[in-house]
């Protein structure tokens, strides 16, 4: 929608326009789907009554689309209407470019995401091609490196035209996102409806599997992304060691690196 070059010219007037370095009281004139110029606040057009007018937001990481596919326990919505609903929410929030974050692989919970991945990507590519989205939708592949199935899955989807960002993550408990192993055990028992002893055994198996397969899976994902020139983000960096690991991998984007550099994170 936002790339339309045949859209009629229109003016948004009497607005507080947020630019890169100032807030300007004026009007924005749009022609051929692009901002043509900024004019005086009293030009004829659609009056905003002094409200703020900001550039469209870019959301690099939203898991929101999966919420529409699984709106409640035991319910799965078809990808096409789920994506349409997601698109509406995105635009209502001022986001004009969204990187829909889809899980490639699974730690243990939400294993259904493996089956969801391909149908969602196919539906997204079709909707993009047919111009059914209002926002620009791109793909952010969140690759679970503690799952050996991630290798095959990433090879199947990383060539999709919309893939523009990859992140590597390891949700095995005891490090990064989940430090409290016991809380993970309790969550596993609740979500998978199994006894605590079984949940604890499954958790121990997951931790062991992460140590065994994560280095190889991580390297595979990194190589696949690098071969296509796709940027890679680290995920859930909690310590300087995590940041150093990210920095050692040439093209990794690490948000926490900036925090450490600024003295906002010391461990």
What are these regions (language model features)?
Residues 93, 161, 248-249:
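Structural motif
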Residues 58-60, 98-100, 137-141, 164-168, ...:
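Hydrophobic faces of well-ordered beta-strands that scaffold small-molecule active sites
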Residues 2-11, 16-54:
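Histidine-rich, glycine-flanked metal-binding segment
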Residues 44, 48-51, 83-90, 151-166:
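Short amphipathic alpha-helices and their capping/turn segments at secondary-structure boundaries
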Residues 51-120:
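Metal-associated gating/positioning segment near the N- to mid-region
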Residues 139, 227, 236-267:
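Active-site-adjacent C-terminal substructures of enzyme catalytic domains
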Residues 14-15, 20, 49, 56, ...:
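Fold-independent oxyanion-binding glycine-rich loops
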Residues 105-238:
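Metal-coordinating catalytic core of metallo-dependent amide/deamination hydrolases
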């Amino acid at each position: 929608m936002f790339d339309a070059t045949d859209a009629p010219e229109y003016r948004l007037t009497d607005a507080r326009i947020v630019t890169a370095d100032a807030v300007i009281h004026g009007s924005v004139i749009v022609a051929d789907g692009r901002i043509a110029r900024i004019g005086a606040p009293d030009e004829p057009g659609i009056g905003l009554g002094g409200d703020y007018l900001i550039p469209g937001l870019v959301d690099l990481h939203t898991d929101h689309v999966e919420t529409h596919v699984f709106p409640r326990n035991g319910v799965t919505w078809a990808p096409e209407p789920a994506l349409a609903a997601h698109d509406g929410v995105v635009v209502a929030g001022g986001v004009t470019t969204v990187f829909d974050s889809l899980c490639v692989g699974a730690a243990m919970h939400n294993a259904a995401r493996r089956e969801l991945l391909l149908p969602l990507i196919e539906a997204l590519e079709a909707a993009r091609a047919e111009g059914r989205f209002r926002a620009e939708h791109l793909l952010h592949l969140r690759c679970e490196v503690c799952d050996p199935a991630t290798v095959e899955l990433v090879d199947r989807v990383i060539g999709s035209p919309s893939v523009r960002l990859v992140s590597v993550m390891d949700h095995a408990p005891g490090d990064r996102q989940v430090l409290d192993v016991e809380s993970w055990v309790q969550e596993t028992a609740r979500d998978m409806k199994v006894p605590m002893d079984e949940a604890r055994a499954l958790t121990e198996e997951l931790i062991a599997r992460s140590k065994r397969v994560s280095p190889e899976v991580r390297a595979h994902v990194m190589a696949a992304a690098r071969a296509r020139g796709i940027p890679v983000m680290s995920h859930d960096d909690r310590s300087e060691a995590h940041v150093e690991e990210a920095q050692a991998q040439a093209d990794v984007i690490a948000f926490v690196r900036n925090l450490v550099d600024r003295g906002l994170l010391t461990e």
